[in-house]
From Swiss-Prot:
This is GTPase Der. Associates with the 50S ribosomal subunit. NCBIfam families: GTPase_EngA, small_GTP. Coiled coil: none annotated. Keywords: GTP-binding, Nucleotide-binding, Repeat, Ribosome biogenesis. Residues 2-164, 235-407 form the EngA-type G domain. GTPase that plays an essential role in the late steps of ribosome biogenesis. One of its GO terms (biological process) is ribosome biogenesis. It comes from the Bacteria. The gene is der. It comes from Sulfurimonas denitrificans (strain ATCC 33889 / DSM 1251) (Thiomicrospira denitrificans (strain ATCC 33889 / DSM 1251)).
């Protein structure tokens, strides 16, 4: 049976979490206390798997507080399989906490950072500071307010073996398990003060069917995992461009059927048409949007079509920006492509009608695209003919690859290795004589990838340096076809 140790300073909520986990299942043993203080040990059931829970709470608060916590914590941690390191989310992270956490990671155990006392939405921003610990297994919770504990339970559950699943829960409910072979941890002669953690205790009512709401922002990482399990197989792709560039022809070529009406009359497609297909276990939903014209030419029902097109883009993951390679590019092409940028979509630039374009000027045409659409520099370019279906099949694998990039989550530790190298190569310029420091970076969202840069003076992150960091990230990771967004944030900023 796996052992789970709850470790941390006094008054961070260890006993509260211990009690919360115990309330999930009432298979309880009794504590025996004497001149030594026993580690509290209980059998618990996480969803339907058994585990042994260890609480190292109750360490005395002497002048050598943290040295004692470290000694006892490491002793308990060495005997555990899973370690929950708890900190106070209302306080700024301390170097001693980080140092101990790093030591716990060297034990080769499953270690999670549990940031307690995130009691309301205003306190959620406090989690940013704890990404300094360099772990992706971070959970912002409030035991006393019963917020976001469920995400932590699921993380623990995934690390418990299948053989620990309880086969007969009815029998188990009647069993009062007494733990044998309790290990004792010596204390100095100071008395244990249980009141240290009483303010954090949470004693729920007898509601066995109580639900745990997952609303944490740690969350960003937890939601990333949740998304990977549920929505990763569905990619929504909007086909956009000005009128008569061949969007409907491209949709038909992709589907292999005449799903969308094709005509030389500009604006044949009024209502966005969506069609789904399966490709390599992925569901691809293509949306043929209404062709967009210059504002002065938009009349009547086309106004509604434009509104629908914008709505579809807001709900899409990716855009195929269709350009007519046989004609000069227009300012309107740039404005339409700007919708991709404003919606932060993954993107492929499609040069259609390549069969009638001047292919001898390939390099010139590609360069013109890059010059006109600099804001889509991350987007690959595909030349094809929707009418003859030539090279259309190239799009499918490209879509899957780009969506993978768009959905990826870079580990905090890996991200900061790249950041450190970039900073060593080119230091941040000062701002009005003031030194600018970047502390760390962490990815907090996907689709698109969003990265927080935590620094002393966020306004000091010049756009040229931001571009430099973006380029370094693109060199280190696969971000082809996807924008990478940065948010400069001050340490401890709410």
């Amino acid at each position: 049976m796996k052992k789970i140790a709850i470790i941390g300073r006094p008054n961070v909520g260890k006993s509260s979490l211990f009690n919360r986990l115990m309330k999930k299942r009432d298979a309880i043993t009794s504590d025996v206390a004497g001149t030594t203080r026993d580690v509290k040990r209980r059998h618990v059931v996480i969803i339907n798997k058994e585990a042994l829970l260890l609480d190292t709470g109750g360490l005395d608060q002497g002048c050598e507080l943290f040295d004692k916590i470290k000694e006892k914590s490491l002793e308990a941690a060495k005997k555990a399989d899973i370690i929950l390191y708890m900190v106070d989310g209302k306080s700024i992270p301390e170097d001693a906490d980080k140092k101990l956490f790093y030591e716990l990671q060297t034990l080769g155990k499953e270690v999670a950072l549990v940031v307690n006392k995130i009691d309301n939405d205003k306190l959620k921003d406090n989690l940013w500071d704890f990404y300094e610990f360099g772990t992706d297994a971070i959970f912002g919770i409030s035991v006393s307010h019963n917020r976001s504990v469920n995400a932590l339970l699921e993380w623990i559950y995934d690390r418990l073996p299948e053989e620990d699943i309880i086969k007969d829960e009815d029998e188990e409910d009647d069993v009062n398990i007494v733990e044998e072979d309790d290990e004792e941890f010596e204390f100095d002669d100071k008395e244990y003060n249980e009141e240290e953690e009483d303010d954090n205790f949470f004693y729920p009512e007898d509601d066995e069917d109580e639900e745990f709401e997952d609303d944490s922002i740690f969350a960003q990482n937890d939601r990333i995992k949740e998304f990977d399990e549920t929505d990763a197989n569905h990619i929504k792709i909007s086909i956009i461009g000005r009128t008569n560039v061949g969007k409907s022809s491209l949709l038909n070529a992709l589907l292999g059927e005449e799903r969308s009406v094709v005509s030389s009359v500009a604006g044949t497609t009024i209502d966005p048409i969506d069609e789904s297909m399966e490709y390599k276990d992925k569901q691809l939903t293509f949306v043929d949007t209404a062709g967009l014209r210059r504002r002065g030419k938009i009349v009547g029902i086309e106004k509604f079509a434009l509104m629908r097109t914008k709505e579809m883009l807001e709900n899409s993951n990716m855009a195929l920006v269709v350009l007519d390679a046989s004609e000069p590019f227009l300012d309107l092409d740039e404005k339409i492509a700007g919708l991709v940028d404003s919606n932060r979509l993954a993107c492929i630039i499609v040069l259609n009608k390549w069969d009638i374009a001047n292919r001898d000027e390939y390099d010139k045409i590609i360069q013109e695209v890059r010059d006109r659409f600099k804001f889509l520099a991350y987007a690959p370019i595909v030349t094809l003919s929707a009418k003859s279906h030539r090279r259309v099949d190239k799009l499918f694998d490209m879509i899957l690859e780009i969506d993978k990039n768009y959905s990826q989550h870079i580990k905090t530790s890996e991200l900061n290795v790249v950041l450190e190298k970039a900073l060593r190569r080119h230091q941040l310029p000062s701002m009005r004589g003031q030194i600018i420091r970047i502390y760390y970076a962490t990815q907090y969202e996907t689709r698109p990838p969003k990265i927080a840069i935590v620094m002393n003076k966020p306004r000091g992150l010049h756009f040229t340096y931001r571009r430099y960091l973006t380029n370094k990230l693109r060199e280190a990771f696969s971000f082809s076809g996807t924008p990478v967004l940065f948010k400069a944030k001050k340490r401890g900023e709410k």
